[in-house]
Swiss-Prot record:
GO MF annotations, alphabetized: 16S rRNA (guanine(1207)-N(2))-methyltransferase activity; nucleic acid binding; rRNA (guanine-N2-)-methyltransferase activity
EC number: 2.1.1.172
Annotated function: Specifically methylates the guanine in position 1207 of 16S rRNA in the 30S particle.
Native species: Salmonella typhimurium (strain LT2 / SGSC1412 / ATCC 700720)
Alphabetical keyword list: Cytoplasm, Methyltransferase, rRNA processing, S-adenosyl-L-methionine, Transferase
Name under which the protein is recorded: Ribosomal RNA small subunit methyltransferase C
GO annotation, biological process: rRNA base methylation
Subcellular location, record wording: Cytoplasm
Subunit and interaction comment: Monomer.
Length: 342
């Protein structure tokens, strides 16, 4: 997180304008500009645990990771700098939450890559903080307005749900496959056999659909679920509760907060971090699994067929097998043996 993103580079073109500002940074915080920006005071709020990990090393208690911001997170701030994510409902959720806590008259800046859909900020905030475009560079747009009217925000109104095989899946903006089961997870689910036993870790759990489906036909499994996303953690907890299932759910950057070993690790690992393509999480998952699997334990993941996971699996475990595939996706399976590189 040392190099600045294009969005941050656009902000830096205007750094002189912020020297006296007390800023809350929020949104898709892909670098450590909030910790390094020259201003009167800097706070940050993020829904992404891995972004909090980086920023908290430099900002301490002035950065907070949570599903929703609280009044204390915006205290004394006179400026919001919001980094637009690629997910429009996620942006709307976060902006309505934060702006409902800030007083009228605060400066509102929205910055993001054009391909992320940052232009949507103008109509989204038209009734609250009418925006004007103040810069365009690095294929990004920077918008500014002043808060004229606080939006109303109620967390309950943002919950959604869908049903699959008799299970209720609870979701929130920003959760992967919020509108229904994705094809990759569906393929992975098709490989999970009834009466699975032991400790199962679901990495990158999203809305908790993999764990809920597994537990519904394998009641003896002991579930642990983790994700970097605060909305995903809350959605997974709600999904388990809605279906009368039990499991431990917490935020973790892949294995960063995971303790102990498991009999199975399942995952539909992401290969994007915001707008950027990144295989870091999947590589960390595969290489780190050897430290969290019992002997004979199994790693089972689904991925786009074009991604180079077979090589990493073979380098780490010594072998892999494809147990299901379509034209776009493959389900990989490997087992913890003596030849695995611990």
């Amino acid at each position: 997180m040392s190099a600045f993103t294009p969005a941050s580079e656009v902000l830096l073109r205007h750094s002189d304008d912020f020297e006296q500002s007390r800023i809350l940074f929020a949104g898709d915080l892909q670098d450590d500009l909030p910790a390094r920006f020259e201003c009167a005071a800097s706070r940050a709020h993020t829904q992404q645990f891995h972004h909090w990990q980086v920023l908290s090393r430099q900002m301490g208690d002035n950065v907070r990771f949570s599903l929703v911001a609280q009044a204390s997170d915006v205290a004394d701030c006179d400026t919001l700098i919001y980094y637009w994510p690629k997910n429009k409902p996620e942006a709307q959720f976060q902006l309505m939450n934060i702006l409902s806590l800030m007083p009228s008259g605060v400066d509102v800046f929205v910055v993001g890559e054009n391909r992320s859909g940052v232009r949507s900020a103008e109509p989204m905030l038209a009734d609250y903080a009418p925006l004007n475009k103040v810069d365009s560079a690095r294929r990004c747009g920077l918008y500014h307005g002043r808060l004229e009217k606080q939006p109303q925000f109620s967390l309950e109104s943002w919950w959604a749900e869908y049903n699959i095989d008799g299970l209720t899946i609870k979701t929130l903006p920003g959760v992967f496959s919020r509108d229904g089961l994705d094809v990759g997870s569906q393929l992975l689910l098709s490989t999970l056999t009834p009466h699975t036993k032991g400790k199962v870790l679901d990495v990158g759990c999203g809305a908790g659909v993999l764990s809920a489906a597994l537990a519904s036909h394998s009641p003896k499994v002991r579930l642990t679920l983790c994700d970097v996303s605060a909305p995903a953690v809350e959605a997974s907890r709600a999904t388990l509760a809605a279906n009368g299932l039990e499991g431990e759910v917490f935020a973790s950057n892949v294995f960063s907060e995971v303790k102990g070993r498991f009999d199975m690790i399942i995952s539909n690992p992401p290969f994007h971090d915001g707008m950027q393509t990144s295989l870091d999480a999947a590589q960390t998952l595969i290489r780190g699994a050897v430290r969290h699997l019992n002997s004979g334990g199994e790693l089972r993941i689904v991925a786009n067929a074009f991604l180079p996971y077979p090589k990493i699996l073979d380098e780490t475990f010594g072998f892999h097998e494809v147990i299901a595939q379509t034209g776009r996706f493959k389900v990989y399976r490997t087992v913890m043996t003596r030849q695995a590189k611990k």
